[in-house]
Amino acid sequence: MFIIAIGDVHVPHRSYGIPPEFKKLLVPEKIQHILCTGNLVSKEIHDYFKVLTSDVHIVRGDLDENTSYPDTKIVSIGQFKFGLCHGHQIVPWGDRASLAALQRQLDVDVLISGHTHVLEVFESNGKLFVNPGSATGAFSNISNDVIPSFVLMDVQSNNITVYIYKLIDGQVKVEKIDHVKQQ
């Protein structure tokens, strides 16, 4: 089962759109779920995600005007509970201890957050933490030099294979991390 973690797109205010190098990889009917950390800013990106899969979960970013998106969301997929938040609620932004506190509060196996626009995937105390970065490379308050990125997760039983996609100098680079759910 394929899950895309993506966010901080900022179209049209900070970016023209998802890079074509990524769009070639995001094929309809191959992806079962999209978990988005927000800051889409425009309806255009939401509609694009719905073309990829009907199962799209989005939380509200600090710049999203769509107030129907929740601040946090829990999604059960297979044997895993995924928690989703934009990340502007985490103080300081991206702080691992604060992320772990939210993970415990939501009682999830995987916490997906954004806001920093910096890709980060790590394990802590048997839990998986994913920040997919910015899919468009939109600048942030932290950095003007943001590498476009997103994360693909392949969920099989109690395993998640995490594929990290980065667009560097016009080339898509992929890294892989394996995570096993602790019982």
UniProtKB/Swiss-Prot annotation:
Binding of Zn(2+) 1 occurs at 8, 10, 39, 117
Q: Name one GO molecular function term.
A: metal ion binding
The UniProt catalytic activity note for this protein reads: O-phospho-L-serine + H2O = L-serine + phosphate; O-phospho-D-serine + H2O = D-serine + phosphate
- Listed Gene3D superfamilies: 3.60.21.10
Q: Which UniProt keywords apply?
A: Endosome, Hydrolase, Membrane, Metal-binding, Protein transport, Transport, Zinc
Entry superkingdom: Eukaryota
Q: Which EC number(s) does the record attach to this protein? A: 3.1.3.3
Q: Which residues bind Zn(2+) 2?
A: 39, 62, 86, 115
Which coarse location class applies to the principal site listed for this UniProt protein? Answer: membrane
The residue ranges crossing the membrane are none
**What family is it from?**
Belongs to the VPS29 family.
The free-text function statement in the UniProt record for this protein reads: Plays a role in vesicular protein sorting. Component of the membrane-associated retromer complex which is essential in endosome-to-Golgi retrograde transport. The vps29-vps26-vps35 subcomplex may be involved in cargo selection.
Q: What is this protein called?
A: Vacuolar protein sorting-associated protein 29
Q: Which organism is it from?
A: Dictyostelium discoideum
Taxonomic lineage is: Eukaryota, Amoebozoa, Evosea, Eumycetozoa, Dictyostelia
